[in-house]
């Protein structure tokens, strides 16, 4: 399926040049930018061949330093070196300060209670800090790709709320780039592995980064990623593994008190040991202490595994809770995706494999997998992948509607409507006392349901039992930027409602869309005739239904010859309604209307008499 180049059948959409777009993983610890080049998605390196950019910003009186330059001063100038700003996004200062963690920054609350950092550069908020991280990534991309970006896809945690997502968009706006889409990080990882095309089922995304652990349980159904549950620990990550090794070194070397410089050296060596034990069973730690003594220690993978075992088991417990929250079992999980550098640790991979009962996906660099998925999405959104199996629409390719009586289609959202979009229409009941209404959502340009594509069916229960036509049901079609359709039906007086979600683009190729459009044009005249016939048949059924109810209630008001005339006209209408002569049905409806005019007048007189019965002139 292709990103739609909308054109009428028989015409060709204008070709376009390759458009520049990238995916950005705006991470808590590190950030990356990726792009699709020559059909392959990969992260982009800076001038020093470094792919990751530490998410660290240092503010001095004269300059703003980002990445490794800023990180180098994190111990010397912690007050003005902001790390993990992602944790501050969309949160109030009260919320931040009420937590157990203390921060070296000088804070001030904004007018709406959000945190502001006081720096030598003045006051900056988390959005501005995030923008300062985004800026070098955008510059790197434009320099590497050789042009101006048309847009970016930025990844965010699945649990980010609207305020946090909006803050991320505003950070991009400060840099001057267009956000094509905010993409959930676990969804990006799944896209990188191609899990969005073809497969259906439950996917677990295990994300163990430097400072945080996240587990996301996704359900993939007909092209739609639904987040079933999320969990994790915002204070557990690979950094904790490093600190455990650091403590082990200090204990083995009897270092009771260490300087800030030695402490940092121990931590750096701990990270090297952790990385070495990923591929080796043993390695040696070497550190020079404050007195110039060279300290050495052999560390085995078994020793390291024993140290971190409790922490790894803690992540598995989070996985168990997330599955329970999602209401699924490990047997239902078809794939487990590993994200984050700390998932390289063999014990982590082993425990995850044991828990889910299958080998996790690790072929893509876990540090880069989210950015790569975002790049694939960005490339599609700007129209660079005409053969993509992902159909991500910026317009509605075929009209969306609902079935009405007689098998007719009431179009709610017309084709070529730009998305996101919301449209609503009101419907009513057909019969007296009707307490439920079945809805059939369809797609296509034809006038009858039988000629359109069925998308979904659902039922609204709890409608008040009123006379036919008295209940008002508002049906809202909402299509988001990802082409996901939500249809909500709500009875207005009670507020009772039901909702269903569907992806209209799933399983639909450009060729099929073109064929459906051509069919609608070729059959337009016949379809209109069939629709007019169906409408008259529905009108006839409605007239006969309401008249039968009226005769059952007030038939005694008629003389025998009057009743016979009406029944004869009703029988004729019922007979013609089964045939295919629209004009004859319309004539029969008019004839029945003429035959019942005296009956309608008698019913009105009788109703007035009953209403006035027992009333005096003075009370009227």
Curated annotation (Swiss-Prot):
InterPro entries noted in UniProt: ATPase_NBD, Heat_shock_70_CS, HSP70_C_sf, HSP70_peptide-bd_sf, Hsp_70_fam, ISC_FeS_clus_asmbl_HscA
Gene from which the chain derives: hscA
Role description: Chaperone involved in the maturation of iron-sulfur cluster-containing proteins. Has a low intrinsic ATPase activity which is markedly stimulated by HscB.
Xref: SUPFAM superfamilies: Actin-like ATPase domain, Heat shock protein 70kD (HSP70), C-terminal subdomain, Heat shock protein 70kD (HSP70), peptide-binding domain
Organism whose genome encodes this protein: Shewanella piezotolerans (strain WP3 / JCM 13877)
Pfam families per the UniProt record, alphabetical: HSP70 (PF00012)
Domain of life: Bacteria
Similarity section: Belongs to the heat shock protein 70 family.
Protein name: Chaperone protein HscA homolog
PANTHER family associated with the record: HEAT SHOCK PROTEIN 70KDA
Gene3D superfamilies named among the record's database cross-references: 1.20.1270.10, 3.30.420.40, Actin, Chain A, domain 4, Substrate Binding Domain Of DNAk, Chain A, domain 1
